[in-house]
């Protein structure tokens, strides 16, 4: 076995996916692994680099397709990917990198605001050695929240925003609103 594998961190908005991604990448950095992080370039809410909702920043390459950064990451053994649901080539890229012996850590929304699978991110589950589904706190009743609820009436899937546009909600609050 070449040591390559895929770790998938999924959950709703505000569940700490990016924070967990950064924690895992930092852990490998401490162990002297050569690490790189990639973020979706259309997510420019807070500036350059990878940002968490609580304003923690981490250096990251930016791309709209992962294949565009292939040449830049050949020397790295750990690849962190934030907002994985937005990359159209996420499944093929992760499988290729893991097969080449790299550790790939992906943070992604598992469902849309309509509680549908988010693009093809769920296709990574059978290819992953480790899958963690995080929960948030329901912003209405303060129970465990597994879903992201959009506050506006827009119907397109890819609308990037924070707590001005989305809430994490439990099942009951999702259905009631």
Swiss-Prot record:
The gene is OPG101. This is Thymidine kinase. The keyword Plastid does not apply. It comes from the Viruses. Substrate binds at residues 113, 157-161. It comes from Vaccinia virus (strain Western Reserve). GO terms for biological process: DNA biosynthetic process; thymidine metabolic process. Pfam families: TK. The active site is at 83 (proton acceptor).
């Amino acid at each position: 076995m070449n040591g390559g594998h895929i770790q998938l961190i999924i959950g709703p908005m505000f569940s700490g996916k990016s924070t967990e991604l950064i924690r895992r990448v930092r852990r490998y950095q401490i162990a002297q692994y050569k690490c790189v992080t990639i973020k979706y370039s259309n997510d420019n809410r807070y500036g350059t680099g990878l940002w968490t909702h609580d304003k923690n920043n981490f250096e990251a390459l930016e791309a709209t397709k992962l294949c565009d950064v292939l040449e830049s990451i050949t020397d790295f053994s750990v690849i962190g990917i934030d907002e994985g649901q937005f990359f159209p080539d996420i499944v093929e890229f992760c499988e290729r990198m893991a097969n080449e012996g790299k550790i790939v850590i992906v943070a992604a929304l598992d469902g849309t605001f309509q509680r549908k699978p988010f693009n093809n991110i769920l296709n990574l589950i059978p290819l992953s050695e480790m899958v963690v589904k995080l929960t948030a706190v329901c912003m209405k009743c303060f129970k465990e929240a597994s879903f992201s609820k959009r506050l506006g009436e827009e119907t397109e899937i890819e609308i990037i925003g924070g707590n001005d546009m989305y809430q994490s909600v439990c099942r009951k609050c999702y259905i009631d609103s």
